[in-house]
Amino acid sequence: MPQKICLISFDHWNYDKHIVDKLKEKGIDAFHIKIGGFKYKNNAARIANSFSKIVLGKNPKIQKRQEYILEMLEKMGVQDQILVINPEVISVEYHLKIKKYTQKYSAYLYDSVSRCPVDHLLEGVFDEIYSFDKDDVKKYGFKETTNYNYLEKQPITSPDLIKNQALYIASFDNR
């Protein structure tokens, strides 16, 4: 029986979908809960959400997205592993509910803790937290990993065929 892995992420640009595709290529029963894929049921729900945000200062869509995650997990059943990318967009309360659907609950941080705080998620929520930020790995004891790139390898182009005159690579940190 193949391992069951669920990926939960916002995935604005369909970048994380490629992770699930690669897992499936390896024979893993993988599925993606795309939080950004949540849609209002109708225009009345959209108007009610806008009213709540403007008048009450509360955004019901945030809670509905989290309920959507639980609905999808209820439908798909218990998973061998669940990986959440950018866990700060989900409340602790919902993380603890999600965790009941798996034996191994992990998080991957797309950014440093200084830019996207996860302090509220450090105690008893995740079995493992992965980060590419060396300072965060050292300070919080996260597991070090790299960023990933879903692009297929391309053959090296002959220098004679290169038309660009410049290449610029930058990083704002100390690397």
Please name every model-derived segment.
Residues 1-110, 116, 122, 127-128:
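N-terminal pre-catalytic "stem/leader" segment of glycosyltransferase-like enzymes
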Residues 95-175:
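Catalytic core of nucleotide-activated saccharide and alditol-phosphate transferases
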